[in-house]
């Protein structure tokens, strides 16, 4: 199989099709574009348990970068579903080449991100294995939401407006600036690289999600994985509609464009943590609320 995220056809054929998902307590069964499980805790209860799992396994040396990406790539799915996070379950798979100090620093960095987000590490599992070359961080974010506040990707409908918050490719730009600094220094100034590297502290869309939901939206999708192109495709697939997008209107920073050109990367395929795709019947109202 090809390295990286599996294709939609493989996901449908060899993963989703194999799952038994019939349960009266499950509001949304596993599907393309739906990144959260939503569970009814009791019959007739309005509060729902919301969970989302993400795995971060990029070869990233900076503990702060790894922690931010691992935690927020999961949390952002919770925010996008209209839920408030409570905590995370953390699983670490550590290569035999690492020492205990690296493990300690990794956990400390993850806990610091959780504290910043107002959540805690609820539990998890840690294991050392020869099967991996880099630390693999798996985060399951757990949150809660009222049923009427849920904003699944599948709720988008024809004729609605599409709003994109944050900046396309911001997370990927930050990772490249932190991890490829020596290469970037052959063209860009230290100030330019430092500014791009600092974007790693701006990949949470919690405030934007809350503002949008308050204004009344139908669907929200986190753009972290697969870049904005992948996220738009997932949302269209989940809702069974087409999306008419003006590429020139997608919010993207100039340094993202320049760094992408330097590495010959499509900026619209970069990790886009901090960016949300919002579908609403009244997009103007949502934008006004976001601009407050």
Region annotations inferred by a language model:
Residues 1-292:
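Helix-biased detector of long, well-ordered alpha-helical tracts
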